[in-house]
Structure formats: C-alpha cells, structure tokens
Amino acid sequence: MEGSEMAKKRPGVVISPDEMNHFLKTVTIAPLTSNMWSVHWRVRVFFDGQNGMIALDHIRSVSKTRLGDCIGSLQMSEIKIIKHTIKTMFVDY
C-alpha cells in the first residue's frame, strides 16, 4: 500500500445496499480503526469491546471472498450518521 492507505487486515462495515450485494461479487466497505482521530469523515462506534472509528475516508470495494465472519451490527442511529456523513463528503462538501 502507498501513502496513507490502511494496509493491514481489519474489520469493516459493509456500506453498499443489500439489493446491490445480492447481485455483485463485491461489496463496498469502510474499514474500522481504533485510531481515534476525530474528524468529520470518521464516525465513532463501539466494536469488538472497544471504541473505534469507521474510516469513511477509506471506502473501497472488495471481493466477497475476502470477508470474514460478521462481528456485529450497527444501531439505526449509527447508520443515519454514516449516511449523512457520506452525503456530506460526496455531495454537499
């Protein structure tokens, strides 16, 4: 990996819609990080027993074959924040 790309294997949040995921061999994900760098394009969550951030600045598509087991799910309030943040990043910025 180059620059500031996240290189190591890490958990992530699938952000592509279920309807899309059903038909494609890839899913769109945002990696989770324990780096608590507080900027508006990262969303704070509690995962795997610790506080962390969804790194929406590192969104990417990956093959479904690279996915591991599901470790949890998000609350609707967290999903709304993620959607708002993505909209702000790519539409309203």
Where are these regions (language model features)?
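Conserved functional hotspots at enzyme active or ligand-binding sites that engage polyanionic ligands
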Residues: M1-Y93
